[in-house]
């Protein structure tokens, strides 16, 4: 039962994160997101539907029920609080915290969650800039847009998509280039290959696929 509980949380978390990106959740995106086979994903999705966590719509997309959304929101909140703890208090490297928080999120009780909020000061975002559900603090300032959409000039990195966090090479590239939330950079030019930027470590080209998942604001 514990294994099914963790699997349920992982799937619901993935569906909610796909929604956050403005994308329609379908089984193919869960296959990509979770790195599992299509038959395995289909079997688990059917169980989610049978247990009342999600609905399979006529267009084959998935929609969380109120029950499923409550669980998904809770696990995303615990995950992002765990990431803040790992970075802010423990000092784990930014690029390592996502996978570590994946291990922690299932073990954090309501009492521990409450203490984490007090310890961390009820943060608005995780270290990757994504909002923590239920925080009393909201992200202020102009809405961020993908790096590919801005004209040349200075920018501030606001957040990195959850989709990037599961890509070891991409997250390592951003850490090495110091293109993490809160950092400053200058967009030099945008091309079909990507976005050439100058950061604290010098000039580099951010591949277009990655740049589309980096959200920035004009500096």
Label for each model-derived stretch:
Residues 21-31:
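Short acidic, hydrophobic short linear motifs in intrinsically disordered regions
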Residues 60-79:
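Basic, amphipathic "hinge/linker" alpha-helix immediately C-terminal to the N-terminal HTH DNA-binding motif
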Residues 39, 95:
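Key DNA-contact positions within bacterial/archaeal DNA-binding proteins
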Residues 49-59:
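A short, conserved structural fragment
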Residues 1-12:
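Short alpha-helical segments that sit at the start of domains
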Residues 105-212:
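Mid-protein regulatory/catalytic core that forms ligand/cofactor-binding pockets
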Residues 11, 30, 41-51, 174, ...:
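Basic amphipathic alpha-helical segments that dock to polyanions
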């Amino acid at each position: 039962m514990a294994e099914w509980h963790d699997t349920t949380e992982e799937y619901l978390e993935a569906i909610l994160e796909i929604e956050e990106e403005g994308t329609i959740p379908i089984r193919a995106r869960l296959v990509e997101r979770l790195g599992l086979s299509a038959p395995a994903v289909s079997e688990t999705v059917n169980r989610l539907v049978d247990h009342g966590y999600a609905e399979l719509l006529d267009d084959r997309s998935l929609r969380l029920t109120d029950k499923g959304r409550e669980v998904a929101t809770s696990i995303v909140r615990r995950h992002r609080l765990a990431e803040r703890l790992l970075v802010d208090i423990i000092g784990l490297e930014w690029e390592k915290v996502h996978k570590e928080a994946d291990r922690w999120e299932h073990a954090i009780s309501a009492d521990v969650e409450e203490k984490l909020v007090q310890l961390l000061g009820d943060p608005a975002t995780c270290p990757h800039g994504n909002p923590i559900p239920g925080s009393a603090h909201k992200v202020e300032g102009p809405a961020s847009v993908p790096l590919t959409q801005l004209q040349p000039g200075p920018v501030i990195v606001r957040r990195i998509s959850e989709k990037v966090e599961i890509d070891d090479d991409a997250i390592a590239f951003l850490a090495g280039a110091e293109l993490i939330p809160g950092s400053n950079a200058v967009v030099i030019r945008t091309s079909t290959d990507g976005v050439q930027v100058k950061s604290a470590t010098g000039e580099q080209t951010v591949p277009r696929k990655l740049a589309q998942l980096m959200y920035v604001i004009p500096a």
